[in-house]
Amino acid sequence: MNFGLEGKVAAVAASSSGLGKAVALALAREGASVALCSRSEKRVGAAMEDIRDLLAADGGKVPPLVALPVDLGSETGPDEFVSAAADALGPVDILVANNGGPPPGDAAGLGDEAWRLGFETTFRASQKLADAVIGGMRARGWGRIVFITSTSVKQPIAGLTISTAMRSAVVGFAKALSDEAAVDGVTVNTAAPGSTATARLEAIFAKRAEAGGVSLEEIKTEAEAIIPAGRFGRPEEFAAAVAFLCSEAASYITGLVLPVDGGLVRSLT
């Protein structure tokens, strides 16, 4: 299937590693020009070079890529990212609003600073990124926005209280925005990864193992056992789902929360 993304400009937030990097690679493989960003100039530059090398090794065309060091949790970071991406590649047609996620913690006893940081880096950054692109997308009559959240928006995950709360707020914002923008050819969706093999998942499991006094392998085995697919997801599997939501083929899909989780979430809606 041709996703119809050749010549489109994509801005993928928090894309120096993990799911963000996998999404950037998937969109570049479909022919989109891609702006990557991270707080670390070194890491985002290395990610861009990795993507370029992978595409070249596959024998495919390498679209324009740009690596931008930006702190999306700052007041001006989201606008800076979108502006710099547009300056380098052209107006942004596709936004993938990703972030590293707030630190884990139980509901009781989380301090004000933890909540403030969670709000700024998870909800506010995503909302600001969308605000920075939505006007241009609607004016041009085409656009794709995909917010990356978590299956916790469908089924809360113990120990990820701030993440669950803030990502659920992102879902509410995304649904409202999808209602407003659909008439102008802009789709707004949310992709909710389940247990996917990334460094963040490894860190969460390591914390659980330490707290429970058990081995990391025990935690991993228990986590895999409750997934109907019987294994953790791969970043490229998640990225393929996001690329589809960004495609011409998904032009009539908007306001959706799509779990990419191997069947982990048991809810009917």
What are these regions (language model features)?
Residues 106-119, 145, 223:
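Substrate-binding pocket helix/loop in short-chain dehydrogenase/reductase
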Residues 135, 179-180, 251:
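Alpha-helical segment proximal to the catalytic Tyr-Lys
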Residues 9, 14-18:
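Conserved glycine-rich cofactor-binding loop
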Residues 96, 182, 187, 253-255:
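Short, small/polar-rich loop/turn modules that mediate ligand/substrate recognition or access, typified
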Residues 155, 231, 243, 254-269:
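Short C-terminal tail/terminal secondary-structure segment
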Residues 146-169, 174-183, 195-196:
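Catalytic loop of short-chain dehydrogenase/reductase
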Residues 32-47:
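Conserved glycine-rich Rossmann-like NAD(P)H-binding loop of the short-chain dehydrogenase/reductase
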